[in-house]
Amino acid sequence: MTEARTSNVRWFLVLWLFVLSAVSYLDRVNISIAGGAIADAYHLSDVQLGKVFSAMLVGYALFQTTGGRLADRYGPRWVLAAGVVWWGVFTALTAVVPANFSGALFFFVAVRFLLGAGEAVIYPSANQFIARWIPVRERGLANGWVFAGVGAGAGLTPPLVTWMMIHHGWRSSFWVCSIIGFFAGAVWFLIARDTPAGHPQVSAAELAMIESGLTLASTPAASTTNPSTMPHDAPTVLVPWRRVVRSKEVWAVTLSYFCYGYVAWIFFSWFYRYLAKVRGLDLKTSAFYSMLPFLAMLVACLLGGTLNDRLTKWKGPRLGRCVLAAFAIALAGIFIALGSQVKSARLASVVLAGGAGALYLSQSSFWSLTADIAGPSSGSVSGFMNTGCQIGAAITAFLTPWIAARFGWTASFLVAAVLCFVGAASWLVVDPERSLMPGQGTPIAESGQVPVNASL
């Protein structure tokens, strides 16, 4: 460990989590851009294509809690690196199905399901990293950077995949995305460590700052089992599942994240196709305007993370985590309802993009709250929460075209707007200072710190 200087290793690693987050969305959204070409090549209907989209999300949802528990037990370095390799393999396999293959639908569903299973580790692992490496006062911005990768990856996907489709065919986009993933995962494995104390480049000053931000100075038990300093092979003490499933806070944020996932995945799964097929924009114009929601997400994640930290420091976590999230999600519902009524395709794209941005203002609240209340079990608890998100996402992938076919696309967006208001209301019952760890309160409003572990 370097002691002669002050380092910022934690932020360098957060930046690489941003890269991995972007790559994960590059690998999951590419099929929504290539979906039209795939549907034409294999004679798939929109409903069948929706099943392919949903398959990834079902696999992603089913393995959230498993991925989170693995990160809790074995650390974010190994688990995340293994996940990147896994999903890189199945991204590449998406491109190998033979032309005119009669079992193409089954093949695509199976491969995308397994891709989702591998991607399930990314955000629970990132949240476990944040619980170990990032002080409470910085968690909003750190999560903002991680999820800004969603906007960056999803925003890069339409022009990149469209260009490759035009010049090299749809299969090339999956090969390129796979190679990018392998590279990003290898770099993560080389530069990351599970704890700050185990990283050779972390200075004494940075380590002390991290440790003081993760624990309550007046709690002796916290300082003895701080995950930032415990040895790599030390036993990990986790919150029992029975305490997780009895928590009102966990169920409230999971319900809200279910609604969030339903709404967000309209943009990831169907927005490009909606602009091209329903609004009548050409391929290149659709690619440009379909970038707008994702660019809005990128900016909103960073802005939301900054607001999260500042409001929490100013008035406590109820304002910084809960009220901010409720306001942002409700605002998203207003934008989406208005955007669905706009006649101009281009203006509708801008208004709907505003809805996507407003939705992502709340992103840091979900993940910062679970890190705050769960500490060493943040991977498991955030994985449980994210399961709700992915169930919502899987439902929207096939339900959105079904609603559109029977009632029109305006109805599809209005359903999403209603769910925004349900998701916003869910935050009103959350107590952000109710720790899942027995015997520990979370006086964040007073101290700016939260305990991250306890003997169970």
Residue ranges and their predicted role:
Residues I31-I33, R242-L302, Q363, W367, ...:
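Extracytoplasmic gate region of multi-pass secondary transporters
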Residues S54-R69, M291-G304:
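Central cavity-lining transmembrane alpha-helices of secondary-active solute carriers
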Residues V85-S102, A330-K343:
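C-terminal ends and interior cores of transmembrane alpha-helices
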Residues F90, A104-V121, F335, R346-L361:
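Hydrophobic core of transmembrane alpha-helices in multi-pass small-molecule transporters
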Residues V111-G151:
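Cytoplasmic helix-loop-helix junction between adjacent transmembrane helices
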Residues V150-H199:
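Helix-loop-helix hairpin linking two adjacent transmembrane segments in secondary transporters
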Residues C301, A371-R406:
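A late C-terminal transmembrane helix in Major Facilitator Superfamily
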Residues R318-F366:
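C-terminal transmembrane helical hairpin of 12-TM major facilitator-type secondary transporters
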